[in-house]
Amino acid sequence: MKFTLSWLKDHLETDATLDEIVEKLTDIGLEVESVDDRAAFRAFTIARVLTATRHPDADKLQVLSVDTGDGKPVQVVCGAPNARAGLVGVLGRPGDYVPGLDVTLSVGKIRGVESFGMMCSERELELSDEHNGIIDLAENAPVGTSFAAYMGLDDPIIEIGLTPNRADCTGIRGIARDLAAAGLGTLKNTLPDAVKGEGETPVKVILDQDAGNPFCTGFALRMVKGVKNGPSPKWMQQRLKAIGLRPINALVDITNYVTFDQGRPLHVFDAAKVKGNLTVRTARDGETILALDQREYKLNAGMYVIADENGPESIAGIMGGEHSGCDENTVDVLIESALWDPRMIASTGRELGIVTDARYRFERGVDPEMMVPGAEIATKLVLELCGGQPTVLDVVGYKPHTARVIDFPVTEVKRLTGLDVSYEDAFDILKRLGFGVEGDGKTIRATVPSWRGDVEGKADLVEEVMRIHGINRIDPQPLPSHGAVNGRILTTLQIRTRHARRMLASRGMMEAVTYSFISEAQAKAFGGGKPELKLANPIAADMSDMRPSLLPGLLAAAQRNADRGFDDIALFEVSGIYEGDTPDKQRRVAGGVRRGTAKVEGAGRFWAGNAAPVGVFDAKADALAALEAAGAPVDRIQIEAGGPEWLHPGRSGTLKLGPKVVLGTFGEFHPDTLEALDVSGALCGFEVYLDAIPEPKAKSARTKPALSLSLFQSLKRDYAFVVDAAVEAGNVVKAVSSADKKLIVGVQVFDIFTGASLGEGKKSIAVEVLLQPQDRTLTDEDLEALSKQIVASVAKQTGGVLRG
């Protein structure tokens, strides 16, 4: 919403400066977005060129003698091609700042001739891009006066951002009312007396609508006969131009002026072009109208028009038709002021794609009590600017506004905002805002004015009191302190998410953020595709289902990188997957994909040899690292061979905690999965379920336990066991670890061997065992006894024997 300072002062009696007004507007919730104060133009004066002679030392320059109105001509050197004797232009004197050149003028010599100023072009004053010559004003322009005042450029332009509820401030009078209520002046009474008309309006208005659900709740029409339409006066044109409107003619400009001045949209018809009476009705399917924007619109039965016997003459409340528009030949004019259903206006405007100042106001809700005064204001302006004889104002379908009454306990202000506002202050604020007020010292009975349709309850009145009293008057309060140690801020799941994300990034993986929507084929390939997880209105055909896994998006991202030359890439994501349409079916998952040779130790070729393609063990290591970082008890995790159907059955695994709790899956992808997703290359991946990790036991103290380190040196022992080929290495590791859980602190497989020397169906698994004594150095007898325990444990759990 734009307006000029002088326009605001038509409604507000105030001595406040521009800065004070701007600051107060923001304080009361009418946030100022920009201020265009063209103060730089005030120094430039209108001057007449008395003589123009050729420069003695430059063919393209002229030496001008310029009259500034004080009887003392000024010498100026000028190179403009249109400089001539008699031209009236704009003079900048030494000390004046030229915004288009970003220079301050001074006395100078040009080719040996002194110049005491500069005749300016429009581009040099940033009025337009025109720079082919200096400004050429009308011959009767007042020489010696301020150019800014002459052109109306000395009036600052203020632009505010309105929230949708403040329909009352779509008119400058509403803004002035708020400023007056905030103590920045007095609101002027600018409403004119009713215009006395003679005779009835010959064109009648018929409301063809459902009386129980009307879309037009009032229609005022008046004819002014014998008008003389032409350009609007300079002051009106300057104001309309300042707010971004193009002056057209006096009749049209008046309607635009009243729209911004009062927030009251109007329309004018050329009475000679209207055939018969005006009927407010629904449009008929297939009807068309050529609107004032020179575009033809196709209407349907869900839209509303003002029509005559020729057909639609106006799209109700949005835009008039070209056929009945007013021009310089208009003699008799019909002035229309009506009330329209905001929902109807919004729906029609969206469907036709029309955005107008009238639609902007009607769909937010205009003041119903301004329908008749708006027509009177427009009539008065028409009579002043165009002459003519008005008829009696014809009002159809209007019912007086019924005001809403709200009982408002003043204590609500303190309860909702923390502001201490006295009963008297709250009473006075609401009264200044135009509310009808009465009360008993505790509760105010407030009658909502017609222009505040957004005020519906006590909370709205609290807001009104708060913004006028001053939000900046809320006393600052320190945040509450609950002791030396702050309470926990993040939830367990948030902590797990953060730790898993950091761990995967530290393993050389790059974080990706993929869509939660995937295609139906992708969803079904990863165990999804349930009807309840299909989107009702997908943004694209290949984004129709909520994802059951992170892997489809990560695989697609890896393939896109490979298609662009980045074959070796490792990606991860920590986000949600969806197993159903209830909140408990949304799970927090950390997933990752490695492609090509993107291993933890590096990718591609290096000095020690070519890197091998990624495989199942890379995915396993990533999954276990993420789980450990998230706080899972990895020493108790069981690894079962095989995984979901989208993973390779012989190169995948499932991570479990006990027989029922699944913590994750990992492995290489099934060839059918890669084919279905149209991806290729060496690929492995994993998913771990962060929400499946059991909650840690509550600690008795917030401090970490004391670090206990052994004083004795650790030692390692190697063992090789011959087991059946079907025995997994992990089972051997668990058997060794269980032999003595206090002494054995680490077990690692370092060799697997198969050969004829072991016998058919046999293999050798070699492990390194790390021992850490706690209370004494181990003797040979201790080591021998431990070895027997390890061999016995492996034999019992796997059937393996110590290799000779």
From Swiss-Prot:
Which InterPro entries does the entry mention? aa-tRNA-synth_II/BPL/LPL, B3/B4_tRNA-bd, DNA-bd_dom_put_sf, Fdx_antiC-bd, Fdx_antiC-bd_sf, NA-bd_OB-fold, Phe-tRNA-ligase_IIc_bsu, Phe-tRNA-ligase_IIc_bsu_bact
Question: What cofactors are annotated for this protein?
Answer: Mg(2+)
Q: What is its main location?
A: cytoplasm
Domain B5 residues, every copy: 401-476
Q: What are the TM regions of this chain, as residue ranges?
A: none
Q: Known catalysed reaction(s)? A: tRNA(Phe) + L-phenylalanine + ATP = L-phenylalanyl-tRNA(Phe) + AMP + diphosphate + H(+)
Where does the record place it?
Cytoplasm
In the record, biological process GO terms are:
phenylalanyl-tRNA aminoacylation
Tell me its family: Belongs to the phenylalanyl-tRNA synthetase beta subunit family. Type 1 subfamily.
Give the multimer and partner information. Answer: Tetramer of two alpha and two beta subunits.
Q: What is this protein called?
A: Phenylalanine--tRNA ligase beta subunit
Naturally occurring in which organism (per UniProt): Brucella abortus (strain 2308)
Its gene is pheT
